Amino acid sequence: MKTNELRNLTTAEIEQKTKSLKEELFNLRFQLATGQLDNPTRIREVRKNIARAKTVLRERELGINNG
């Protein structure tokens, strides 16, 4: 998910997206531990998406208008 797409969402939607991404990351890590993960790069993508979402939320808290 791109940062601009996140900026178009409401704060509640971003928080919900972050929650679902964290759940996905948990499941991916579990699959990795059990040897069932097909695409290990997906873990990195999900982690980066979580960081992007948290960054947009923090920008809103601080009143920073990027993008």
Curated annotation (Swiss-Prot):
A Pfam cross-reference name: Ribosomal_L29
Transmembrane segments: none
Alphabetical list of CDD domains matching this protein: Ribosomal_L29_HIP (cd00427)
Presence of the UniProt keyword Ribosomal protein in the record: yes
InterPro entries: Ribosomal_protein_uL29 (IPR050063), Ribosomal_uL29 (IPR001854), Ribosomal_uL29_CS (IPR018254), Ribosomal_uL29_sf (IPR036049)
MF terms in GO: structural constituent of ribosome
GO biological process, one term: translation
UniProt KW keywords: Ribonucleoprotein, Ribosomal protein
Stated family: Belongs to the universal ribosomal protein uL29 family.
NCBIfam families named among the record's database cross-references: L29 (TIGR00012)
Official protein name in the record: Large ribosomal subunit protein uL29
Organism field: Halalkalibacterium halodurans (strain ATCC BAA-125 / DSM 18197 / FERM 7344 / JCM 9153 / C-125)
